[in-house]
Amino acid sequence: MTPHAAHSRPHPDAHCVFCAHDTLDVVLEETEHFLVIADHAPLAEGHLLIVPRDHFACYGALPQELDDEAHNLRERATRFLTSAYRPPIFFEHGVFRQTVSHAHLHALPLGAASHGFADEVGRIGRPAPSLDALRAWYAEQGHYFYLETERKETGEREALLFPPEMDVYFRVMGTLRDHTAHTAAWVPPALRQMQGGAKMRALAAAWHTYFEDRD
């Protein structure tokens, strides 16, 4: 077994902003093992993160007993974002290109991807129908880039894993921009953070309004 395959519960990291839960700006929801938070440098209004409370390196390191809870939060985020904004994409850098070294899944309401997107990037990605696929890749190869989109033509969701290579990453994300309804603010994080306060507050208000009549 490689070091990547061990799933023992990690200790909090004193230097990790996601471990210091009380310092997070906008927490939308808390469950036993996860937090749903507004991204502090949003690419678009509605950009949120699903973050495990424990300090796992990436979703490929999550133990199976957290799968149902993680899935339920993804479904919850999908329903909310589709209703309040547009269908989301989910992506995770899987240690590769992480700005915080703590697992976090991005949900970004860019809209469904056209058929052309799947045709262009499907050839270089590996299907990832469950978290088991992430765990297998992480145990065997370490870093990865994960992306899940909704097909515009069918409404079905499709998840792919990509090798952690910069040219692949920029090709996939560039193609995604060309095949979704909404163009996110692909600007430097510092500028997004400076402009993000209003978007975070708007997201929090929309989240609580949406769920107050449904929970």
Locate each region found by the language model.
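HIT superfamily nucleotide-processing domains
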Residues: 1-215
